[in-house]
């Protein structure tokens, strides 16, 4: 580590991984909230809501890929593309309701803003954050291979979080694919869908705990099958 570098190589990778873990957790929280809103409160998503949820899933794929296979610029680029699609969808929904005088908006409001407004804010922050991380070259230059490459001290925790996150993304994709069939059929989805089944919070919490338990088991066996090669990074 040179005198001008504040962080060592391992510290740099640790900070980069923690940033991606935090981003993945935040996006999973948003997606979990959307599932709870759909099944717990019976609020079926509108067509633009489905676009935003799908884009949020794509946005979360970037951090997951960084954690699994190492820090790569193309992973951030994938998240930026997903955020641009989601931002366009949420901006379109905002303008639709703003253009109609007296329109109360679609769905519940949180802290004075509807969910599509919060989605737009999330996508804007994601684009700005990915742009800043793209300008941070050191994690790209260190040859990081991710949790599926070489061993590091927090690999087990990172592997568990990533697998748990990917399972959540898979569940959300399945929910989108299955729910649009009875809701939309083979045509366009209704702009203002009727209320759906209200299953309560118990089902949502059971799903979260079940996914966490399965992810922990998978992460344990993956960890056992991985080699014992210690992590090495390129010298600065």
Residue ranges and their predicted role:
Residues 2-45, 56-57, 72-236:
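Secretory/periplasmic and organellar redox-cofactor proteins
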Residues 52:
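Cys/His-rich metal-chelating microdomains
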Residues 59-70:
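Canonical alpha-helical transmembrane segments
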């Amino acid at each position: 580590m040179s005198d001008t570098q504040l962080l060592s190589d391992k510290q740099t990778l640790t900070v980069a991984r923690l940033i991606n873990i935090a981003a993945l957790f935040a996006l999973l929280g948003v997606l979990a909230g959307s599932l709870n809103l759909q099944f717990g409160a019976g609020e079926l998503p509108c067509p633009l809501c489905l676009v935003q949820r799908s884009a949020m899933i794509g946005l979360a794929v970037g951090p997951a890929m960084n954690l699994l296979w190492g820090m790569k610029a193309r992973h951030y680029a994938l998240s930026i593309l997903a955020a641009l699609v989601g931002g366009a969808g949420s901006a379109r929904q905002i303008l639709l309701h703003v253009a109609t005088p007296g329109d109360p908006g679609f769905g519940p409001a949180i802290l004075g803003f509807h969910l599509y407004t919060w989605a737009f804010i999330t996508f804007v922050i994601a684009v700005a954050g990915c742009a800043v991380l793209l300008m941070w070259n050191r994690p790209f230059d260190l040859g990081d291979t991710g949790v599926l490459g070489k061993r590091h001290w927090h690999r087990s925790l990172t592997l568990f979080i990533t697998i748990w996150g990917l399972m959540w993304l898979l569940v959300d994709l399945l929910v989108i694919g299955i729910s649009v069939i009875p809701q939309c059929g083979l045509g366009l989805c209704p702009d203002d869908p009727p209320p759906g089944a209200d299953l309560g919070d118990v089902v949502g919490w059971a799903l979260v705990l079940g996914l966490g338990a399965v992810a922990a088991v998978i992460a344990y066996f993956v960890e056992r099958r991985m080699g014992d090669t210690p992590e090495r990074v390129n010298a600065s």
